[in-house]
Amino acid sequence: MSQKRIAVIAGDGIGKEVMPEGIRVMDAAARQFGIDLKFDHFDFSSWDYYEKHGKMLPDDWKDQIGGHDAIYFGAVGWPDKIPDHISLWGSLLMFRREFDQYINLRPARLMPGIIAPVVRRDGTPRQPGEIDMYIVRENTEEIGRAHV
């Protein structure tokens, strides 16, 4: 069984709350499929890091996380403490640009047992399999256009 290394960056706010549960889910799935996961935790991209260092990321951030198989990122932004342009430009958009994460791909499927808010023309509910699509969003340009 090969090991997969995951860089874990909780960030701020809800990220710190949900990351432990997300890791539990990944661990359970990995056991089910015979995958060995190793989680490396990083404290940057957070208010705490910014308060101590005056920036969101260390100079060698890409070297620290670049060799991992995946990055598991919680949340960025705490407008009461750090202006959005600093937290976004200082971390999240850096990750997206440096690792060429230009697409935000979101599957949308109607699952069994879920009543869809989208109905047929006659008003009857849609059934599983009738809604199966992907939403594709550009992940780096919207906010970053003025800074290119």
Identify what each model region corresponds to.
Residues 1-13, 31, 46-147:
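Anion-binding alpha/beta catalytic cores of soluble intermediary-metabolism enzymes, centered on
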Residues 2-40:
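N-terminal phosphate-binding or glycine-rich loops at protein starts, especially the Walker A/P-loop
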Residues 42-44:
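Short loop/turn motifs enriched for small/polar and acidic residues
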